[in-house]
Amino acid sequence: MTVLYISDQPGLEVFKNGKWNPVNHVPDCLVINLGDMMQVWSNDRYPAPVHRVVVDTDAERFSAPFFFNPSYQTDIAPLADTSEKPGYQSINWGDYRFRRAEGDYDSYGEEVQIDQYRISQP
């Protein structure tokens, strides 16, 4: 999960319905962005948005993100819910984070995504 403070300049966008959409900007407010592990824990009830920041080079923009992550030893799986089957296999956060970081460098690894842990439903 990310808690993001944004000053008075907008720029955060989310990809939805096949296009980039600006996030409604409210000055001096906090934006909460749920990440991949929250999507897995919630079994897709709370999807992690694909997002980006578009910078206006004529205006100064300040943001202060705070990232909250589980312990590296934590195994992440959908929380128990008897009404639906789990959509993901268990993911170790430390291994996942390491593989994501490796994927940032072409010569070290592949860009791992949570969809690689999705369980196919018949």
Q: Where in this protein do the model-derived segments appear?
A:
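C-terminal flanking tails of non-heme Fe-dependent oxygenases
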Residues: 1-122
